[in-house]
């Protein structure tokens, strides 16, 4: 059995990160990645089935850990809905924000690849599915607890989409981690006040 050349794998990963970060998934070239790594394109295909697989290998976010953390958040949202307790609702929002802030800080470049450089990839499709499911769950959460018959729930989807765009803009602009922390602190004030007002609007007949 041939011994895997880990040094070569490291060169491929380094070259791939540089190429995808600069050009994004759609415009990145496997030929250029192979050349930067000092191998042939054919040799690259012996390790990765194609560009999608190589791109996905660069994103090693701790999905299981994030999922477990979000499960705790879901329980808080459930509690706030059952009790109609705005303080528990705000606590859930804070915890959810902390999860994403920590992810941005710990895996900054991978988040850039995921949110800003994945257009056209299978990774982008998976992310879009996750976002769509999140929209659906959030809208359902508010519908179940709402006493306000005139509330337009399309607004919830638009607000959530705006928040996602906010995260994407932070990554697009290439701010330092220190600046991201400052920006997120200001955003938290805005987000928490807005959601608190929406919550109160929903539970008022």
Residue map of PLM features:
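Hydrophobic/aromatic residues within well-ordered alpha-helical segments
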Residues: 58, 62-66, 93-96, 100, ...
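Hydrophobic alpha-helical connector segments
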Residues: 57, 72-105
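Short, basic, alpha-helical segments at the C-terminal edge of helix-turn-helix-like DNA-binding modules
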Residues: 30, 59-74
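C-terminal/domain-terminus segments
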Residues: 2, 17, 111-131, 187-194
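Helix-turn-helix
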Residues: 11, 15, 19-53, 57
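N-terminal intrinsically disordered/low-complexity leader segments
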Residues: 1-4, 203-204
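Hydrophobic/aromatic-rich alpha-helical bundle segments in the mid-to-C-terminal region
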Residues: 113, 141-191, 198-205
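Amphipathic alpha-helical packing segments from all-alpha helical-bundle domains
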Residues: 99-106, 119-146, 154-164
């Amino acid at each position: 059995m041939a011994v895997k050349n880990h040094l070569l794998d490291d060169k491929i990963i380094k070259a791939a990160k540089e190429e995808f970060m600069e050009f994004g998934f759609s415009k990145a070239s496997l030929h250029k990645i192979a050349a930067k790594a000092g191998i042939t394109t054919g040799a690259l295909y012996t390790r990765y089935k194609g560009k999608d697989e190589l791109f996905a290998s660069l994103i090693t976010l701790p999905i299981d850990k994030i999922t477990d953390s979000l499960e705790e958040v879901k329980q808080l949202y459930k509690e706030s809905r059952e009790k109609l307790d705005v303080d528990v609702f705000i606590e859930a929002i804070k915890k959810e924000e902390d999860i994403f802030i920590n992810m941005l800080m710990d895996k900054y470049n991978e988040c850039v690849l995921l949110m800003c450089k994945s257009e056209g990839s299978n990774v982008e499709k998976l992310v879009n599915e996750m976002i769509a499911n999140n929209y659906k769950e959030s809208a359902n959460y508010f519908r179940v607890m709402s006493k306000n018959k005139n509330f337009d729930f399309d607004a919830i989807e638009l607000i959530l989409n705006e928040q996602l765009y906010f995260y994407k803009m932070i990554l697009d602009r290439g701010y330092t981690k220190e600046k991201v922390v400052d920006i997120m602190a200001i955003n938290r004030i805005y987000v928490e006040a807005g959601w608190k007002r929406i919550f109160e609007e929903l539970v008022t007949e």
